[in-house]
UniProtKB/Swiss-Prot annotation:
Enzyme class: transferase
Protein name: S-adenosylmethionine synthase
Binding site residues for L-methionine: 57, 100, 259, 290
Gene: metK
Residues bound to ATP: 16, 174-176, 259, 265-266, 282, 286
Cellular component GO terms, alphabetical: cytoplasm
GO MF annotation: an example: magnesium ion binding
Cofactor: Mg(2+); K(+)
Principal cellular location given in the protein's record: cytoplasm
Location of region: Flexible loop: 100-110
Purpose of the protein: Catalyzes the formation of S-adenosylmethionine (AdoMet) from methionine and ATP. The overall synthetic reaction is composed of two sequential steps, AdoMet formation and the subsequent tripolyphosphate hydrolysis which occurs prior to release of AdoMet from the enzyme.
Organism of origin: Acaryochloris marina (strain MBIC 11017)
Record: residues binding Mg(2+): 18
PANTHER family: S-ADENOSYLMETHIONINE SYNTHETASE
Cofactor info, note text: Binds 2 divalent ions per subunit.
Length: 418
């Protein structure tokens, strides 16, 4: 990396078509797990003008009305006007669900360790729901130990959605943000560009000229969104920061009418904004036996505790799994030259102190019980604005309860480096 460089991350609002799908998928998951924590769920959603398709594979004892759940979530997001081409009460909802494949189920229900190696350990009972590789990341750029660009991008979209609901009534649900941060010697030092694209009414009060409409939106967003977002942050926009709003000149047609949406298409928004690697697996609509989701949460948990313990300024963790096998195939820890101890020793301590089998992840985080314990909604709340670094939610994988344990276990190595 050069000494001075720019890094960009994006976020999208809850009304973005892909995020509509993610939230519907996780609303279905919440409803099923609330009634039957053993539910196996892979709920996929497609949205387009006037249409929602719910498909995938589900095995459950729960009894839910899928159509009602879909319409309720769309209403909550804000699509209630059929004149905009997509509305909760007028869209068609098609349901095409199958049961989980028995070939997959047999490997999840009884892991290889139990079937072939005759392990009697309870946590060896559940096999990974698929093969795959997952990454987790943490760094000390923000209090929540997230990269600054994605943290800011999420702040902008969350604030944009909030002012749509409470202050700027001419805004519509679809929207995106993008924040470009200036780095020097690996540390953020400035804000180069802030981009906001937001769906809006064609006119604002008596303002009908398109250019005047955009000027009004830009002024309002600067005052109601950008300034509050940066109010408590040391690094702020300055006279050299570019502020771009709806660069096409207009954003009236949006949401599922403007673009089809699909579950699982915003995996970089869901994670670290491109700052860390990604294994490719999406989260939403998947029950916790799917390691795409649960192991990615575990990777974040490990990485965050390492950084919180002061053992590294940056940490990336990779896990990989084989379908039907409980124990990870591989574990990798990378600290990018910022680690205070040898990575091999760090890996050893992580393996000794973190449970990384699927049943262990489910048990550690309570992943199958959380929807029922939290009033029927948990996963749908992380389906927009990121699964990590959420200071507004109580997420078990964001805990730093292992930091002191790691420091204690590695204290001899830390003393040796002093």
């Amino acid at each position: 990396m050069p000494k001075r460089y720019l890094f960009t991350s994006e976020s999208v609002t809850e009304g973005h078509p892909d995020k509509v799908c993610d939230q519907i998928s996780d609303t279905i998951l919440d409803a099923l797990l609330s009634q039957d924590p053993a539910s196996r769920v892979a709920a996929e959603v497609v949205v387009n003008t006037g249409l929602v398709l719910l498909t995938g594979e589900i095995t459950t004892k729960a009894q839910v009305n899928f159509v009602d759940l879909v319409r309720q979530k769309i209403t909550e997001i804000g699509y209630t006007d059929s004149d905009n081409g997509f509305a909760a009460n007028s869209c068609s909802v098609l349901v095409a669900l199958d049961e989980q494949s028995p070939d997959i189920a047999q490997g999840v229900d009884s892991a290889q360790e139990t079937r072939e190696e005759k392990s009697d350990q309870e946590l060896d009972a559940i096999g990974a729901g698929d093969q795959g590789l997952m990454f987790g990341f943490a760094c000390n750029e923000t209090p929540e130990l997230m990269p600054l660009p994605i943290s800011l991008a999420h702040r902008v979209t969350r604030r944009l959605a909030a002012v749509r609901k409470t202050q700027l009534g001419y805004l519509r649900p679809d929207g995106k943000s993008q924040v470009t941060v200036t780095y020097e010697d690996g540390r953020p030092v400035g804000i180069d560009t802030i981009l906001v694209s937001t769906q809006h009414d064609a006119t604002i009060g008596d303002i009908t000229d398109p250019a005047a409409v955009q000027a009004k939106i830009k002024e309002d967003l600067w005052n109601a969104v950008v300034l509050p977002v940066f109010a408590d942050i040391d690094i702020k926009p300055d006279d050299n920061t570019r502020f771009l709003v709806n660069p096409t000149g207009q954003f009236v047609v949006g949401g599922p009418q403007g673009d089809a949406g699909l579950t699982g298409r915003k995996i970089i928004v869901d994670t670290y904004g491109g700052y860390s690697r990604h294994g490719g697996g999406a989260f939403s609509g998947k029950d916790p036996t799917k390691v795409d989701r649960s192991a990615a949460y575990a990777c974040r948990y490990v990485a965050k505790n390492i950084v919180a313990a002061g053992l590294a300024e940056k940490c990336e963790v990779q896990l990989s799994y084989a379908i039907g096998v409980a124990r990870p195939v591989s574990i990798l820890i990378e600290t990018f030259g910022t680690g205070k101890v040898d990575e091999d020793r760090l890996l050893q301590v992580v393996q000794e102190n973190f449970e990384l089998r699927p049943a262990g992840l489910i048990q550690t985080f309570g992943l199958t019980k959380l929807p029922g314990e939290r009033g029927g909604r948990f996963y749908q709340d992380v389906a927009a604005y990121g699964h990590f670094g959420r200071t507004d939610l109580d997420l078990p994988w964001e805990a730093t309860d292992k930091a002191d344990l790691l420091k204690q276990a590695l204290s001899p190595a830390l003393s040796g480096n002093a």
